[in-house]
């Protein structure tokens, strides 16, 4: 789900959403259904979309891009926190640590991750290069997280993303 005022109005070509879709197509070998949304930087719109994707569409993982900086309209983390039952602070911490190896301004990022029911929701940076740098690393934990929440087993292409699972959880 891309969060961007300009992209949602068609004033700017969304590059973040396609970068995430590219990763999915390269890394995930299991059959999957992808639902794409491009919405404005608005807390209520973001919350509504997240709730719809999890509660109505049954998404086990919802990945957002955009709206995580310090600008007044960057409200994706607040919307994510509002709809999640439990937060997963390691996601935001790890994404900032990864990005700090590339740019000092990564400290300005406010990405979060959390659980809504048995679904994982997390925010990625907005730029395709930063998306790839972070998703390559954090996705290593996502399939096992989905396993633990009772979701479908995600088979990964180990050459693209060597996801970690304890021996007892491997198929």
PLM regions and their residue ranges:
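Non-catalytic beta/alpha edge segments that cap or flank active sites
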Residues: 1-171
């Amino acid at each position: 789900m891309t969060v961007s005022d300009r992209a949602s109005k068609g004033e700017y070509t969304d590059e973040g959403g396609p970068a995430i879709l590219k990763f999915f197509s390269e890394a995930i070998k299991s059959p999957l259904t992808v639902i794409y949304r491009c919405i404005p930087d608005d807390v209520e719109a973001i919350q509504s979309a997240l709730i719809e994707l999890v509660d109505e569409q049954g998404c086990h993982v919802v990945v957002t891009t955009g709206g995580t900086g310090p600008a007044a309209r960057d409200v994706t983390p607040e919307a994510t926190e509002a709809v999640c039952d439990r937060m997963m602070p390691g996601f935001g911490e790890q994404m900032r640590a990864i990005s700090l190896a590339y740019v000092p301004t990564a400290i300005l990022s406010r990405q979060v991750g959390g659980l809504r029911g048995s679904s994982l929701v997390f925010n990625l940076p907005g730029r395709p290069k930063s998306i790839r740098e972070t998703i390559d690393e954090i996705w290593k934990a996502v399939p096992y997280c989905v396993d633990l929440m009772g979701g479908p087993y995600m088979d990964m292409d180990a050459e693209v993303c060597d996801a970690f699972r304890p021996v007892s959880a491997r198929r």
